[in-house]
């Protein structure tokens, strides 16, 4: 994601605490018709949330597990002709009932699946992390541009009211000059056999999966792109975390001189916060990155922002971008690329025993 954090962060528009999330939606002639690809736990969350959507509707599924098909057809009214597997995915190209495919497959499959969907001419949303590395992310962006399709990454918090208010305050100067950022996100992971603990499917561990929340948050909290990275890993369970990172702390240096202290883990709970301090005030979100409810406070008191269904807001918001031409809130593939450049640097620093890794020109 190394183009300019300022672009993504600046696009986070302000939101009044008394306003509904999207009070002025232009209603198009049709809804955005969406197929979900990869019917795991998160796909179920997205599907349920989409029942609240004004501008998007679930019309199709792509799955490699035939036993899931009947339940999904029953729960969401999916027609037989809109059910696909990974072998006949290319046939979506000829299906007018599907405008966009939302990819929620394991991390290391994102690159392959985005290229396949782009080749069908359908728009793409891909869950984060967008890819295994920045090189793959760049290839995905290029493929979507060549195909003439929109490519978004599932940064749902870019539509979340507390997050948007924090960015509004920073942009308006209400926090003053940003002095420090402290972000962390993690949880104690369960089932030791799950794909998130297998590098071939996950691409990495806590840093790849949930560390990107702390990283992305540091970027929009400062409105800057980091110029250097240092990182350290703690591994207390070398059996469970044999293939992937367990707990990572990392520091991001920004052009203004601000240093963000960040952390992520797969080995303990109660680790979720975004805290930005300026010379005029502060803003804190805690919980900051989960599915909600997000809670926030500032030097002025509680934020008192509306509580929303994140995935419904994301899908309606991106449908508005596609159907009505509304500018996107920093969720394109380029935003995913910016994060992956930093993730690559974190892993490089870990390999080099915490060495400072410079981004761009040294």
What name fits each language-model region?
Residues 1-21:
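N-terminal export signals
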Residues 7, 301-362:
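C-terminal helical cap and adjacent loop that interface with cofactors, partners, or active-site loops
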Residues 14-53:
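C-terminal segment of N-terminal export signals and the immediately downstream linker at the start
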Residues 55-76:
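NAD(P)-binding Rossmann-fold cofactor-contacting core
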Residues 81-143:
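Beta-loop-alpha module in the N-terminal Rossmann-like domain of NAD(P)-dependent dehydrogenases
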Residues 139-156, 176-181:
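Rossmann-fold dehydrogenase core element
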Residues 157-241, 353:
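Predominantly a Rossmann-like dinucleotide-binding segment in NAD(P)-dependent oxidoreductases
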Residues 215-291, 312-327, 358-361:
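Contiguous beta-strand/loop segments that form the cofactor/metal-binding neighborhood of enzyme cores
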């Amino acid at each position: 994601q190394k183009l300019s954090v300022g672009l993504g962060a600046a696009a986070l528009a302000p939101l009044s605490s008394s306003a509904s999330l999207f009070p002025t939606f232009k209603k198009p002639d049709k809804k955005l018709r969406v197929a979900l690809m990869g019917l795991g736990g998160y796909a179920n969350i997205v599907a349920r949330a989409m029942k609240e959507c004004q501008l998007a509707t679930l019309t199709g599924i792509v799955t490699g597990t035939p036993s899931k098909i009947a339940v999904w057809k029953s729960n969401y009214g999916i027609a037989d002709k809109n059910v696909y597997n990974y072998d006949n995915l290319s046939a979506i190209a000829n299906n007018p009932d599907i405008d966009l495919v939302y990819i929620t497959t394991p991390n290391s499959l994102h690159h392959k699946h985005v290229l396949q969907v782009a080749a069908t001419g359908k728009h793409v949303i891909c869950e984060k992390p967008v890819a295994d590395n920045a090189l793959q992310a760049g290839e995905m962006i290029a493929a979507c541009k060549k195909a003439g399709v929109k490519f978004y990454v599932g940064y749902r918090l870019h539509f979340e009211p507390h997050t948007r208010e924090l960015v509004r305050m920073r942009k308006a100067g209400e926090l003053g000059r940003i002095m420090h950022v402290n972000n962390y996100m993690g949880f104690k992971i369960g089932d030791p056999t799950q794909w998130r603990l297998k590098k071939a499917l996950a691409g990495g561990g806590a840093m790849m999966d949930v560390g990107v929340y702390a990283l992305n948050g540091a970027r929009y909290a400062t409105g800057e792109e980091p110029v250097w990275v240092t990182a350290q890993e703690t591994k207390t369970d070398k059996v469970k975390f044999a293939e992937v990172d367990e707990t990572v702390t990392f520091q991001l240096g920004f052009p203004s001189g601000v240093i963000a202290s960040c952390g992520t883990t797969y080995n303990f709970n109660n680790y979720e916060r975004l805290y930005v301090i300026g010379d005029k005030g502060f803003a804190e979100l805690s919980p900051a990155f989960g599915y909600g409810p997000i809670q926030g406070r500032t030097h002025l008191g509680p934020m008192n922002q509306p509580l929303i269904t994140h995935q419904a807001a994301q899908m309606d918001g991106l449908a508005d971008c596609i159907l009505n031409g509304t500018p996107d809130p920093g969720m394109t593939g380029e935003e995913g690329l910016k994060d992956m450049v930093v993730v690559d640097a974190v892993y490089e620093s870990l390999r080099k025993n915490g060495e400072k890794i410079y981004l761009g020109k040294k």
